[in-house]
Amino acid sequence: MYHDLIRSELNEAADTLANFLKDDSNIDAIQRAAILLADSFKAGGKVLSCGNGGSHCDAMHFAEELTGRYRENRPGYPAIAISDVSHLSCVSNDFGYDYVFSRYVEAVGREGDVLLGISTSGNSGNIIKAIEAARAKGMKVITLTGKDGGKMAGSADIEIRVPHFGYADRIQEIHIKVIHILIQLIEKEMVKA
């Protein structure tokens, strides 16, 4: 009954991944991002991650696999997803939703830390403000974006962009794969410490 639709969806996902893989700069950006994160951890820094909706879940997934585990047991790495409900509701109410991530970065971000901002459109105002706050703190910035990078294009030290202009779920599928590869590479870098 739905075999054609299922095949179509899987083929579109495979095509999106194939297009991402064609650009060697994406592979280089993933490697540079992993090394940047591992270097921050080795120097006593941490990563703060943020996103909205499904990207918020990806930010949480990234942090939990760093503090918990990915495939193998190892020491936890300092990662915080900006996801505390009381913080989010307080700042949304008192300052506006555009400030939910930047206020947290202002409070706990330090020079040597890294911000990972995830936005499929690249146009999330609250992540743009978080990037500005991270810059003011002397933090490095990595972004996972999609389409043409939106307003976030060019704002990060390292941008990993999925150049897909269809539905956001295709971009998110590549983002989660990139997140898993980042963690795998971070683990390899950390054993070099």
From Swiss-Prot:
Q: Which GO terms describe its biological process?
A: carbohydrate metabolic process; D-glycero-D-manno-heptose 7-phosphate biosynthetic process
Pathway terms, separated by semicolons: Carbohydrate biosynthesis; D-glycero-D-manno-heptose 7-phosphate biosynthesis; D-glycero-alpha-D-manno-heptose 7-phosphate and D-glycero-beta-D-manno-heptose 7-phosphate from sedoheptulose 7-phosphate: step 1/1
> What does the record give under GO molecular function?
carbohydrate derivative binding; D-sedoheptulose 7-phosphate isomerase activity; zinc ion binding
Cite the binding residues for Zn(2+): 61, 65, 172, 180
Cite the SIS domain residue spans from the record: 37-193
Q: Name one GO cellular component term.
A: cytoplasm
Free-text cofactor note: Binds 1 zinc ion per subunit.
Q: Which residues bind substrate?
A: 52-54, 65, 93-94, 119-121, 124, 172
Q: Which UniProt keywords apply?
A: Carbohydrate metabolism, Cytoplasm, Isomerase, Metal-binding, Zinc
**Catalytic reactions of this protein:** 2 D-sedoheptulose 7-phosphate = D-glycero-alpha-D-manno-heptose 7-phosphate + D-glycero-beta-D-manno-heptose 7-phosphate
List cofactor names only.
Zn(2+)
- Supply the SUPFAM superfamilies for this chain: SIS domain (SSF53697)
Write one Pfam family the protein is assigned to. Answer: SIS_2
Q: Where in the cell is it found?
A: Cytoplasm
Q: Tell me yes or no: is Hydrolase among this UniProt entry's keywords.
A: no
Q: Tell me where it mainly resides.
A: cytoplasm
Miscellaneous note of the record: The reaction produces a racemic mixture of D-glycero-alpha-D-manno-heptose 7-phosphate and D-glycero-beta-D-manno-heptose 7-phosphate.
Family affiliation: Belongs to the SIS family. GmhA subfamily.
**Complexes and interactors:** Homotetramer.
Function, as annotated, reads: Catalyzes the isomerization of sedoheptulose 7-phosphate in D-glycero-D-manno-heptose 7-phosphate.
Protein name, entry field: Phosphoheptose isomerase
Q: Which gene encodes it?
A: gmhA
